[in-house]
Amino acid sequence: MATIHVDGKALEVNGADNLLQACLSLGLDIPYFCWHPALGSVGACRQCAVKQYTDENDTRGRIVMSCMTPASDGTWISIDDEESKAFRASVVEWLMTNHPHDCPVCEEGGHCHLQDMTVMTGHNERRYRFTKRTHQNQDLGPFIAHEMNRCIACYRCVRYYKDYAGGTDLGVYGAHDNVYFGRVEDGVLESEFSGNLTEVCPTGVFTDKTHSERYNRKWDMQFAPSICHGCSSGCNISPGERYGELRRIENRFNGSVNQYFLCDRGRFGYGYVNRKDRPRQPQLADGTKLGLDAALDKAADLLRGRTIVGIGSPRASLESNYGLRELVGAEYFYSGMEAGELARVRLALNVLNNSPLPVPTLRDIEDHDAVFVLGEDLTQTAARVALAVRQATKGKAEAMAEAMKVQPWLDAAVKNIGQHALYPLFIASLAETKLDDVAEECVHAAPADLARIGFAVAHAIDPSAPAVAGLDDEAQALAQRIADALVAAKRPLVVAGTSLADPALIEAAANIAKALKLREKNGSLSLVVPEANSLGLAMLGGESVDAALDAVISGKADAIVVLENDLYARVPAAKVDAALAAAKVVIVADHSKTATVDRAHLVLPAASFAEGDGTLVSQEGRAQRFFQVFDPQYLDSSIQIHEGWRWMHALRATLLNKPVDWTQLDHVTSACAEAAPQLAGIVNAAPSAAFRIKGMKLAREPLRYSGRTAMRANISVHEPRTPQDKDTAFAFSMEGYSGSAEPRQQVPFAWSPGWNSPQAWNKFQDEVGGHLRAGDPGVRLIESQGDRLNWFNAIPGAFNPARGIWTAVPFFHLFGSEESSSRAAPVQERIPAAYVALAKSEADRLGVNDGALLSLNVAGVALRLPLRINEELGAGLVALPKGLAGIPPAIFGASVEGLQEAAQ
């Protein structure tokens, strides 16, 4: 710690920070533009000027940029010095010479950092009366709108996009006061993290195009703390609603998880919530709409006296899955995961529970100095993990700078010292990945061969690990190099997962973790699982969806209740058809119109994450609560959307002719926690419904929320009472606590007086860029218990394909491989058409060129798909894009036959 003196007051700060960060962490206001907590300091904008003095006797001082000045012990500065204030005001005035006067029509208005800083400096009159420079805007795709005339040349966008996120297609062009930030030509931004430009940019150059179609100001939206359902990373989000529609998603700061950034699937994939074809009223197969009571009575009549299987879902909350389990009984509750996937998730859970190495948070991943990714294309399967791994490789430059006594926040100096030096990253994958540019070495092979390399790495680290027989010299040498790098590191990281449908990859990663622990390495093990609640569902229990369908087909059960799951996306259609035909009753509760919904005798409209509350468990084992953003019945009383657990419990009560016991979320959460030992901690994932600050509930709406009394004027001139939330500590109102002075974990939206932009998160943190003052949201359910794993010995044989027989393997796409986000219109523009990928050698042998139409038979399913030649894919492999339309599920690892050019 260090003592600095600010305007005569002695204050304790972190001496490793710069003055800007230190002062902001103290709650003091200094305007800034180019600095960002995740990007460091470059001193480009000159906005954060303060007066620095030699000591308490110095009355003259000198102006310095606070972001470029260390917070050294004994530093004397003044923020309120008149010369400094005049300097800061003049900087804003210079920026305004070319900035348009378009705040009323600018989509950044109301959450604009430039507006905040302009007000903070006191600039309120423009004296510049001459021609402004103008630019041509670009079409950057379906996610980002571009208005270059608003640029203030802070360089944040390119520093984030190129230096932080690793993008290559956004740059800066021009010179002096006429620079242009964009692409060489119009086109879709290629980075999977481009959406963060909308929050990184302090002005309205880059704005959310998905919000533009139905735009409103930030102060006119209703928010709630939520969790992204797009993958298993568990990123925290703030969805905003107006008039019963989700309008945008903003990043919600969690210092242990996503910090300041989201992937584009998580930010822009919310459109399925607003789809017109969603189930909104209970409906019979003939199209008859029912009310709430009639639907429950009908469902009870259909199910009474029958043996019911309940099929849950890894995209549904723990509470909803538990509600289904209580309805049908634990014996007849099924997880909803395909058999192979469930086995792999269970294996991952067992490994994490008993691993000798801890499970890292997303933020922890950034602090490792050697990484081995085994079998995962992280950018496509867990994008936010990929971004964290990219930051881990860049830690080498910071370490080199530290050795030269250069502060890590001096961004340009650190890069100059590092000269592109990176910590070692090794990637073993099917084909090329978006992280290859920062990898020391990459190897591409079949899943079995990747696993063999992993087992060989473990043996090279510790000879007591099982050896791999028949490994060729090249692979053995690679395994030795990977092992040497992991052992040489202070904090190595191993990342694997379930994606390639081969449990041997997880077992190999577990062996590496055990070997590293035996070498006394302070490492970590991270395992990627498929969906938002896959790990939580494995903790809750339940067999596979295959077993559920078998039970119906065999006559063991004659009724099916499906919760938030499309069975046709899990197992082959023929098996689903057989089970649904055998079932006397099929009831589906879901928030989206799926093929399974179309086959239901009764559909119950379930809440999406925006209309309900619940708990998810991320791949880290972190239980996190998501909260209802809005009540859909407020604007349309005919809507009967309810959380899955409410439907299930009400149906159970109707069947048993008993009163409803679970009247609020806390009741079902507590019951679920008691039923599954590993889920006992979920009650602590968020405050209870009784939580208050200064006697008030927490406001979902900003103080300036407008139009509430007029929103239903077209329905009735009589204003109803606002919805009452009995489930949580939040109010559907601006009436409640919304400030930053009182520490709290669950923050619906970031706002503080004078801070309307996302930079308002400064006011909620223990130190800027650190953690929330009340602690980061969520509770970890998995903590390392020491080494309780034995060596995994089932090492697969080498992949040796027979001529004319291929093996199907999955390629993943951030846009398209996840079910719900693929229903969002902007995301659909980014989803590729279905294809089949082959190695160049295989294409040559078949005599076909790129784009040729091929026919093939995989697991009994005939397909006709265009060819994509992949230079990195191994021989004997046929890659198919998982989740894309036309690609059947549960085929990966199966044999492919009849591969040939299709007859025209």
UniProtKB/Swiss-Prot annotation:
Please tell me which top-level EC class this enzyme sits in.
translocase
Query: What does this protein's record comment on cofactor binding?
Result: Binds 1 [2Fe-2S] cluster per subunit. Binds 3 [4Fe-4S] clusters per subunit.
Which of UniProt's keywords are assigned here?
A: 2Fe-2S, 4Fe-4S, Iron, Iron-sulfur, Metal-binding, NAD, Quinone, Translocase, Ubiquinone
| Positions of the 4Fe-4S Mo/W bis-MGD-type domain | 221-277
CDD domains named among the record's database cross-references: fer2 (cd00207), MopB_CT_NDH-1_NuoG2-N7 (cd02788), MopB_NDH-1_NuoG2-N7 (cd02771)
Xref: PROSITE patterns: 2FE2S_FER_2 (PS51085), 4FE4S_HC3 (PS51839), 4FE4S_MOW_BIS_MGD (PS51669), COMPLEX1_75K_1 (PS00641), COMPLEX1_75K_2 (PS00642), COMPLEX1_75K_3 (PS00643)
Q: Which reaction does it catalyse?
A: a quinone + NADH + 5 H(+)(in) = a quinol + NAD(+) + 4 H(+)(out)
The positions annotated for binding [4Fe-4S] cluster 2 are 151, 154, 157, 201
Can you supply one Gene Ontology CC term for this chain's record? Answer: membrane
Give the residues annotated as coiled coil. Answer: none
The UniProt record lists the 4Fe-4S His(Cys)3-ligated-type domain at 83-122
Please explain the role this protein plays, according to its UniProt record.
Answer: NDH-1 shuttles electrons from NADH, via FMN and iron-sulfur (Fe-S) centers, to quinones in the respiratory chain. The immediate electron acceptor for the enzyme in this species is believed to be ubiquinone. Couples the redox reaction to proton translocation (for every two electrons transferred, four hydrogen ions are translocated across the cytoplasmic membrane), and thus conserves the redox energy in a proton gradient.
Q: How does it assemble?
A: Composed of 13 different subunits. Subunits NuoCD, E, F, and G constitute the peripheral sector of the complex.
Which named protein is this? NADH-quinone oxidoreductase subunit G
Instruction: State the species of origin.
Output: Pseudomonas putida (strain ATCC 47054 / DSM 6125 / CFBP 8728 / NCIMB 11950 / KT2440)
